[in-house]
Each structure stands twice: as structure tokens, then as C-alpha cells.
Curated annotation (Swiss-Prot):
Family assignment from sequence similarity: Belongs to the ArfB membrane protein family.
Transmembrane feature ranges: 9-29
Function noted in UniProt: Required for wild-type expression of ArfA and ammonia secretion, not however part of an ammonia transporter.
The name this protein goes by in its record: Uncharacterized membrane protein ArfB
Keywords: Cell membrane, Membrane, Transmembrane, Transmembrane helix
Length: 50
């Protein structure tokens, strides 16, 4: 029974670490996409606005 409890703890730790990694990667991709979109937006000088 000790093996099952230890294995369950390792499984929970793995799932928790995977969830944290997924959140970090998802947020960094969203932030990079948002920054990239802002960099590609034309400025007022490029659009001819005065």
C-alpha cells in the first residue's frame, strides 16, 4: 500500500508541475502575441493622420 501512496504523490506532483508549465507557456505566448501585434500596428505618421 505504501507504494501506491508514494506513486500517487509522484503522479500528483507531475500533474501539478505540468499544469504550472502549461500556464506559464500559455501566458508567455499570449503576451508575445499581444506585443507583436502592437509592434505591427501602423503609427499615425504611417497612416497619413495629422
Amino acid at each position: 500500500m505504501d507504494f501506491v501512496i508514494q506513486w500517487s504523490c509522484y503522479l500528483l506532483a507531475f500533474l501539478g508541475g505540468s499544469a504550472v508549465a502549461w500556464v506559464v507557456v500559455t501566458l508567455s505566448i499570449k503576451r508575445a502575441s499581444r506585443d507583436e501585434g502592437a509592434a505591427e500596428a501602423p503609427s499615425a505618421a504611417e497612416t497619413g493622420a495629422q
